C-alpha cells in the first residue's frame, strides 16, 4: 500500500501532508492486502499485510514513527508488518504513528533481525525511501554493523 501511495504521490504537483492524506483516503477502501512470505533470520513467516516496512531508524515521514524502537546502531533491522484495519479504525491506528507507539496496535507485528528475505515471484511495487520502483526478484536486506564511516572536517 505504501508503494502505491508513493507511486501516486510522485504524480501530484503539490507536496506535503494534505495531498498524501488525500491519496491514502482515496485508495484505502478498495486496496486488497497482499500475501507475503518472509525469511527473518532463518525463520519463515507467512502473512497477509497492508504493507511491510523495513526500518533502521524510527522515522517514516511527516514526523511519524513506523518503528518506534528502531535504533541506528543496534545492528538490527526492524520489520514492521501492518495488517489492514477496518476503515472505522483507520484514524485510531494512524494516530499511533504520530504518538510514537504504532507498535501498540493489534494490526501491527514487529520483528528485529540481522537478515531478511522477501520471497517474490511476480512484479512487486516497492517504496524505497519515498521512491516507487518495481521489482520481480526476491528482496534481501542485511545489516552490516559499523559499516558507515563519517568523516568530519
Where are the model-predicted features located?
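Long C-terminal subdomains/extensions of small-metabolite kinases
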Residues: 1-153
